[in-house]
Structure formats: C-alpha cells, structure tokens
C-alpha cells in the first residue's frame, strides 16, 4: 500500500501544470481586426452567414484565426461557426500563412448549357492563369445560360467567355460587378409605382379584393411547385401572432435566369409585390434570400431599399436582404429558412410546414421572386389580364428561361400551355444554324428530358401530358438540345450536379447520387441497379432534390435508350 502511494505521489509531482487554457486561443492581432470590422454592430445569431461574408469580402478568404476571433466576439462555439462556414461552397477557409495572399476566385460555369458551349475546355485552358493571387475553379449554374459559356472573375461576369476575354478581365483587375441601367425608385414612382400597395395599406383595396384577384387570375408559384398563390396567402394570413414573408431568390436550378433578368431591369415591381404580400398577411418583416452568384442584383436591391427607407415607403429594416453562399439546396423553402436563420441549409422534416412554423418558429409566407413580380399588375389591370394570356386551356403565362441550341435564347414571356415547338419557332427564331432539334429539358435539371418527337406537349403546371411523360415544368428552365449532343453526357452532367449539391443529410440522396454517377460513368450501364437506385431515392429522400435527382437518368433510359450500351 505504501509503495502504491509513493508511486502515485511521484507521478503527480512529475505532471506539468497547464498555464494556458485548452482549445484554440484568440490572438490579439486577429481579435483587433475583427473587432474593428464589426465595430458598432449588434450581433445576432441569425446573421452568422452575413458575418462570414463580411470577413471574406474584406480579407479575400476566411482565415481560421479570424473565425476564432469571431467566435469570441459573438460568443458562439467555434464548432458551430465551422459547421456553417464549411457547408457553403463560396466560403474559402484557410490556415494562416505569411506567404498566403487573398485570392480572386475565377469560377467557370459547368452547367449543362455552358458545357454544351465548351466550358470544360475553357476551364482547363484557364488553369494556366493560376498563381498565388488567382484561383480557377468550376462552379454550378450561374444563371446566365443565355450567354454561355460564362466565367465569374471575382464578382464580375464574362459572358460568351473565351480565354482572351477572361485573361483581359484579370489583367485589368476588373473584379467588381457591372451595374446595368434599370428602373430606379424615381422612375418607377412616375409610372404609378407603390400606388396599389398604398391603397391596400390604407384599406382602399380590401384584402378580399386582393385575394379574389389572385384566385381568379390563376397565378401559381413560379419557383417550381406551382401552388396557387392566393390559397397560400390565405393560409398564412389566418394564423395569429408574428408572421414573416420570406422571398426565395435562390435561383439555382440549372438553366434558370428569369429572376435575375427581372431584378436587373425592374426591381421595384418585385419589391411592391413583396410589400403587398406583407400587408396581406400583416408581416413583421420581409426577408429576401438572394443567391451569392448575383452580386449585381444584391447591390441593386440594397441601394433601392435604402431609397425606399429614406422616402419612408417602408420602415427601416423592414426589407432585409440575406445573401446565400453557393448552396443549391437552399432553393428548397425549409432549407432557405434555415439559411436565413444563419444555419446550414438542411431541409426540415415535414409536417409542420413553414406556413405554420417557419422563420424563427413563426408562420411564414414563402414566395418565389417572379410570383411577387406579377402581383401589382394583376391587381392593377384585373385578373382577366393575366388569366386570358394562357393557351390550350391554361391560365396566365410563364417566363421561360430558354437556352441551348436556339438562335435567340433568353427570357421568353409566353402563354402557359405553349408547346416547345411553338416556343422555339415563334419566340427563339428557330434552331441555331447547323443544328437539328433532338430533345429538350422542360423544367431545368430536375424536370426530366423529352425527345423532339414529343414537341406538342403543353408546358404548364399540372400538365397531364407532361406528367405522364415523367417530366414537370419546374422553374420553366428550357434547355434545347440538338443532334450535336450526346444524351448520355447530358444526363451525366446533370447527375454530377445533384451529387455535388446534395446536402448530405439523408442517406438515399447522399449515397444514391454518388453511386448513380459512378454507375453512369461506366462504359456499359447496369440498367437494373440504376433503376433500383432511382426508385429508392425517389421514395426515401427527405426533399425534392433527392426525389427528382434521377429524372434525367430515367428520361434517357426511356426515350434515348438507343444511345446507351448495357451490361
């Protein structure tokens, strides 16, 4: 016993005392830099993603020691900051190094349309320009498919890009976003802007009149689900207590660029629609979630909202713009809510739905940006103005984002129910020279692929013919394919996108997309395994990403099987 005590005492004497706390310690230099950067701010947990943006905007990257300092200042666990920062593709976390310089990132769009126009070769060529200040990386769809291929240099876009144009942009250090001419607040008000919103606010136009107009017009959500707008507004308005409007501007579906087009030309038509929605449900605030790939749009919105506050059209901080950070999954409404709250964009299990328990645990009206864009016109001009624009028995119109092998791509406002052949011939001036129509994506990456022989299907939400074909309209992102395009490569491009953008929360999507891509990269496809994977993902995934990810695969197996060799 004495021997045991003696050994214990000896071991205790040998143990060195710790003179510093455990864990990563904040250094005064970095604490001072972060403190000065955020001087005067009242810190809120839900603004964490914006704090990370501010740090990266200032220093070019997210230094890990700055994150330690941020953790200390806002009293948030470092692990929580790291899990958020590492979730989003646009945040670049680095170890501190004396020879490390802030990086200007050159992102080459690798979406389907850009790939059709040579993005893969362009990416490899641009890699030659890399140095300690320039980093060249691939990036998902940037919402500029009508001017493919696209390259983002810093925050400045080079459209119809080639090596020389990108090199010139880098050499001239032209990294800031270009701001186009657009209808500003003064010009918008001269044309009756905000008069409808004021009439609703003051009771001159009743809520019943607003609801009747929306219902009679047949306006449906333009983000992809096609849920009746009036019904959604009514559901949220019936809840008591605090309520919010959350606008989904995370236009990440490959092939989609309509929202960007509207905001870069007529932002107040959307803002008035959002204001009307807030009056209708009696919202506390309006949160506008905008994808980080749209720096021009973000600047326009911030500038114009400041003007609205100055003219007392809205109270200060009534409209709040939140930047995303490169996560496609945040286009799903509950994932968007999580991101607005400063967390990882993981879709929530439902029920409850966000209409009941949404932003900050309150009833929340979520609308796509374009949906709100048309609200003022429908109320001002009457529901028939919108409803009668449809065709083939459908109401209203769609803003089709058309890209690919057509002569004149772009946003085409065309009747709901129009066919792809009409859209190509009457709105896009036909196929591009030297190209024969082969197939098309009616609704972006997740909407499936149809052959040119099925060119008479009405394009609208709830189109029976479209659903029977295994496809849907989604965000109305139409990509036109020709005889120059290999359908196996097309489907693989789309599945790689879903593999990259899976949030990883559920196994069917996380593992399913990875396994599907591997099987599709084989020379010969294992048809049975691919079908089994597709079925499991569709039935067991938490959200629409995993459920619809294999739609391109299913379409190729069904309509372009002659281009595939099987085991």
Where are these regions (language model features)?
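Hydrophobic alpha-helical positions that pack around
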Residues: 298-416, 428-430
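Gly-rich Lys/Arg/Thr-decorated short loops/hinges at beta-loop-alpha junctions or inter-strand turns
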Residues: 188-195, 247-259, 354-359, 401-406
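Ferredoxin-type iron-sulfur electron-transfer modules in oxidoreductases and energy-metabolism complexes
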Residues: 15-106, 110-142, 146-176, 195-216, ...
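Histidine-anchored nucleotide/phosphate-binding helix
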Residues: 88, 266-280
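Short loop-to-beta-strand transition segments
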Residues: 232, 429-444
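Short amphipathic, charge-patterned alpha-helical segments
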Residues: 273-275, 416-432
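Short strand-turn-strand beta-turns centered on an Asx-Gly dipeptide
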Residues: 153-155, 403-409, 442-443
